A protein has these predicted regions:
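Conserved N-terminal subdomain of the carbohydrate kinase-like
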Residues: 1-39, 209-219
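Conserved phosphate-binding/catalytic region of the ribokinase-like
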Residues: 56-60, 108-219
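Structured loop/turn residues at beta-strand edges in well-structured enzyme cores
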Residues: 26-29, 90, 122
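Short secondary-structure boundary/capping segments
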Residues: 25-26, 86, 119, 128
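Nucleotide phosphate-binding site architecture
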Residues: 15, 103, 199
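Conserved beta-alpha-beta core of the PfkB/ribokinase-like small-molecule kinase fold
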Residues: 33, 39-117, 125, 133-136
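Electropositive phosphate-/nucleotide-binding environments in soluble metabolic enzymes
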Residues: 2, 45-49, 79, 162, ...
Length: 219
């Protein structure tokens, strides 16, 4: 893929100054899923408190929580991240992580399947491990599903992880089976990689048919 460069000035950014008081927490009980990211947890103490408030409301209301570890070495150390993750992950329904991020969480250099089981032991119902060009796998109900990455003319991989999450959660909310969720997530991430920028390539459900295969099928 072509090399891209992203400049993100986190210090003093709007995201770093968010507080729990800024959140419309009344929206959470009416939501079908709450998606959180480790970047928000890492930005500042106030943004971490905001995440905690949202998570607490979702837990009380019985709203499923999705959490992507999204580790960024520029924001905090692996030890700091692991400590925070271990307070959040047990309260989540779905956890997304790359192999490297999963190893930070569990503290062991395990393979993807082993990492999924280790994370599931912490409490989440579903664990999804993203492994870039090698594909992805999920552990749901004690069963492992794996889907290979699609061969595409990659232009820019920035945003592929978020696109993957969006595709997976879309499948979950539409009632797709675990493997179909992974297939949908893989297709959405592929679209993200075929254009510059982190959101510009986001597909509609109609767009997904252009890649062929079972991505638009809810089983």
């Amino acid at each position: 893929p072509h090399r891209g460069r992203v400049l993100y000035y986190r210090s003093g950014s709007a995201g770093s100054t968010i507080t729990a008081a800024m959140l419309d927490l009344d929206l959470i009980p009416r939501s079908r899923v709450l998606h959180l990211t480790g970047i928000t947890v890492a930005l500042s103490a106030s943004s971490r408190d905001a995440v905690e408030s949202a998570l607490s409301v979702a837990s009380i209301a019985g709203v499923p929580v999705s959490f992507d570890l999204n580790y960024r070495a520029a924001l905090w150390s692996e030890l700091e991240a692991r400590t925070a993750y271990r307070l959040i992950v047990p309260r989540c329904t779905v956890v997304f992580a790359s192999v490297a991020e999963a190893r930070i969480l569990v503290g062991k250099p395990l393979a993807a399947v082993e990492l999924a089981y280790e994370i599931a032991n912490l409490g989440p119902t579903e664990v999804v491990i993203k492994d870039g060009g090698r594909g992805s796998l999920s552990l749901v109900g004690g069963k492992i599903e794996s889907v290979p990455a699609l061969e595409i003319p990659a232009v820019d991989t920035v945003g592929a992880g978020d696109a993957f999450d969006a595709g997976y959660l879309s499948g979950l909310l539409r009632g797709a089976e675990p493997r179909a969720r992974l297939e949908l997530a893989t297709a959405v991430a592929a679209f993200a990689c075929m254009s510059s920028g982190d959101w510009e390539g986001s597909p509609t459900h109609a767009d997904l048919a252009l890649l062929g295969g079972p991505h638009d099928v809810v089983r």
